[in-house]
Amino acid sequence: MTKKLAGSAAALMSGTLLLGACAGGGPSSAEGAFTDDKIVIGVLNDQSGVYKDLSGPNSVTAVEMAVQDYLEKYGDDAVVTEEQIEVITADHQNEPDVANTKAQEMYDRQGADIILDVPASSAALAVASQADQKKKLHFNIGAATTELTGAQCSPYVFHWAYDTYMLANGTGKTVTENGGKDWQIIYPDYAFGQDMEKSFTEAVTEAGGTVSGSIATPFPNDNFSTFLTKAASGGPDVIGTMQAGGDLINLVKQYNEAGLRDQGISLAVGLMFITDIHSLGVDQFEGTTFTDAWYWDMDEESREWADRFLEEAGSRPSFAHAGNYSAALQYLEAVQATETDDADTIVEDLNGKEVEDVFLRNGKIRAEDHRVIHDVYLAEVKAPDEVTEDWDYQNILNTIPAEEAFQPVDESGCEMG
């Protein structure tokens, strides 16, 4: 089904969005420069499950905003017109087999030049494999596994927003250095959780702490009470949860109901999005320290963009939404620079490129492993009486510079083919 660009949820969920002609028209692309004389951007993510709020339809909104900003910036000089840019979307249901099938459909049947987003690490690795086989692009924003820039790296895959090393390097190290020496870790038993457990164990140990136990849970999962009881039984300083999205919300609620905070057991959250805080309430997360890739109200530039996003989506953006905007915009900038959708040419343009946009601060696209490094932030959830408006949930404690935030390239294990 094809629809004109629209801001409604129905349009976002329709599967295909064709961006209609802009007022001033614009030049046609160079003869033969673009496959089927158009650019097709796929957004593949969770639109119905535990990650739909942090990603989902609003990631499509962010990509649409990037398209419109590209067209507005270049006007008649844009190498592709609005009529030639198509945004397609699908729900991978957080299942790697579904993600694999949807990626094949996007690349082969729908002509996708690039697939964006793809939360859930197992799903992301499936899509990355398809991208590598088909020599098509995948910019991953939603998943955390370092395998995307490690042993399973590919010339056609870029990891845009965050990863488990970044999260552990910020939160694991800081909490341990501030007195949380004895940890129990609860993690979802799939690629993301396994990678998080490994990264946090390494970070805690390097900071002088110990992980006395790790507990794997099903994914997705509603009831964490048994796992929390087991983790708390040894009297650790910290329970580190590696859940995300709806699973994180369930775990935090049950942690508070069990009174574990009152027992002196802190909760460290490996991965948190602002949508998680909004769903459960700032009082449930008060004082939680975590590492954030971006925050909507961290400066004037981010707030201005977030105000636009609020008008389009009805909510403030998560860092995944901002990351999807950035990835789509930088892809279109590469198309503009090269005047083609040829994947190898786009990769050559992006490799080693320094990037500044609303999401990427001090950004650089590493040619060696395609890890996109950028400044990240140590954040703390505000107390309820500090909140001045809806979505005003975080204090930024400090900035972690790009070169310190991410795994050194010589440790990545990537052998780029």
Where are the regions that the model predicts?
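Periplasmic-binding protein-like
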Residues: 106-119, 139-141, 184-187, 235-245, ...
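Extracellular/periplasmic periplasmic-binding protein-like sensory domains
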Residues: 255-327, 336-339, 392-417
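Short, low-complexity disordered leader/linker segments with a strong preference
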Residues: 1-40, 413-417
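Beta-alpha junction/loop-to-helix N-cap segments that form part of ligand/metal-binding clefts
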Residues: 26-32, 55-59, 73-151, 160, ...
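Segments of small-molecule ligand-sensing domains
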Residues: 311-321, 332-396
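Short, polar/charged alpha-helical segment
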Residues: 54-78, 198-206
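Extracellular/periplasmic Venus flytrap/periplasmic-binding protein
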Residues: 98-101, 146-147, 154-257, 294-304
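Extracytoplasmic "Venus flytrap"
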Residues: 31-35, 39-64, 90-96, 119-120, ...
